[in-house]
Amino acid sequence: DPITNEIGKTIIFAVSQNHARKLTEILNEFAEQLYPGKYNSDFAVQVTSQVGDAQQMTINFTNNNLSGKTTWLEGYKSCKTRVCVTVGMMTTGYDCPDLLNICMMRPIFSPADFVQIKGRGTRKNTFEYTFKNELNEEETQRHEKEVFKLFDFFANCEYFEEKFDYDEKLKLPKPKKGGGEGGGGGIDIDKYTSYRPDPLATMVEEQIGEYGMRIDRELFKKFEDRIIMD
């Protein structure tokens, strides 16, 4: 956050509800280690369909009152909770202008979903803090939002930049015949131990240039072609 220098507001997109719950636990443990007594397990919250009042939590995150106000600077309008961990919520139609970080901790195969998720960080915002100076006069500190960070743990950016076939013609699947009852659903795996190196230790930050990402150019081109045809 440009005003308080605490971690900016963040949305994490997880693979499943269990994954979201585990990420929330880990982040709150880290927050307590780094900032003892500052967040009291409110640093990260799980915002999924299994959590009561999840929809209201998304609204409170936008309105900067989720879990109360930030404790870093009295009078500054920002919420205490810094990270919302979700699966499918907070994508299409969700607006949070002061969002500074988006973490993709799940694979994304739909260009529309990728654009929607990435678009959560593109909203413009002015961070403001009004205070009284030594002369008891009001001053306002302002910072314009110029960038946001996209943390991609599943190479989604690479997939839509280099591997996705934008010219592929999709065919609708034919309906299946028969009256079977179907399968019994997936397997719920609660615990998983990974021995791979920490990706954060080797993560490379790449600045997106003025021409944007390929997925944006392709979608704009399709829109342009449709307008010309009409």
Regions found by a protein language model. Name each.
Residues 9, 41-44:
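Residues that mark the start of a beta-strand
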Residues 18-26, 56-59, 158-162, 182:
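Short, charged low-complexity intrinsically disordered segments located at boundaries
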